[in-house]
Amino acid sequence: PAMIFPEVLQKAQAELTNWLGQGVSVMEVSHRGKYFMELIAQAEKDLREVYHIPDNYRVLFLQGGARGQFAALPMNLIGEKGKALYLNSGHWSATAAKEARNFAEIDEITIVENGDHTRITNLDFSDIAEQYDYVHYCPNETISGVEIFDVPNVGNAVLVADMSSNVLSREIDISKFGVIYAGAQKNLGPAGITLVIIRDDLIGHARQATPSIWNYATQRDADSMINTPPTFAWYLCSLVFKHIQAIGGLKEIAKRNAVKAQTLYDYIDSSKLYRNV
C-alpha cells in the first residue's frame, strides 16, 4: 500500500457518516442504488478522461488483486495458439508466469541482466510474438527496483501489462496494449479493488470452465458487480480520479513523481550506507 492524497482522505473523512446528505456512509448504501450507480459511472468517466482510454476499451473494477488476474488472463485470452509468452523482469512477472502455467502452455524469456548495474536486454519480440495468444510483462518490478519505460514491440500480438505499481504514474498510449491490469493499492486507492482495462475484441473468448467472477464478459455485462463490490474502495478511487483531474492530470503527476524519485536517488548516491545498483 502507498500514500493516498491527503485531500482525498480529508474529503472521505468529512463524508464518512453522511455521504451526499443521505445520513449514512457510502459503506452502508446499496451498491445497486441510484447514488452508488451514479458514482461508478462518474468514476469510469473520470478515469477515461485522465488516462485517455479509447472508446473500444472496457473498464472493469474487480476483486482478487493482481494475483487474481494472473489466473484470469490465461482463462480468458488463451485461444487457437494455445500458449502465451511471459517476459521475466523480476519477481512479479515470474509469479504471473508460474500461475498462468496452471491453465496454459507458457514460454518465458528473461529480459534483465544483472551485473554491476541491472539493465534490460531486449524489448523487440516482433519476430516471435504472433506465435502466442498474448505477451505479458510487468513494467515496474517493485521488489528488484526495475522499471521499464519503453513498451515492448510485439507487432500485432496482444500485449498485456501488470501495472499495479505504476498505473496512473504518467501518460501512456493505451492503444498499444490489449489488457492493462492493476491492484489499486499503489496509485488508485486502497487495497480491495482491481482495475482491468481491456480491448473490446478480447472479451468473450473465455474457456467454458472459467469461473464467472473471472470471466471478463460476465463482469462487463454485470457492470463489474456480479457480486457485491468493495464499495468504499471504489468510492475512494473515484475521489482519486477527481483529484488527479483537479491538479492537472497525469502530466502533473509525472512531474511530482520525477521530483520524488530524484530526491530519493540523490540521497542514496550521497549515502555511505546505501548504494544504487
What are these regions (language model features)?
Residues 21-69, 76, 90-91, 99:
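Conserved N-terminal alpha-helix of the aminotransferase class I/II PLP-enzyme fold
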Residues 78-94:
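Conserved PLP-anchoring active-site segment centered on the Schiff-base-forming lysine
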Residues 160, 174-185:
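Conserved active-site segment immediately N-terminal to the catalytic lysine
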Residues 1-30:
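N-terminal "arm"/small-domain region of PLP-dependent enzymes with the aminotransferase-like
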Residues 253, 265-277:
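Conserved small-domain helix->loop->beta segment predominantly found in fold-type I
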Residues 5, 184-265:
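Active-site C-terminal subdomain of aminotransferase-like
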Residues 100, 111-167:
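Active-site phosphate-binding strand-loop segment of PLP-dependent enzymes
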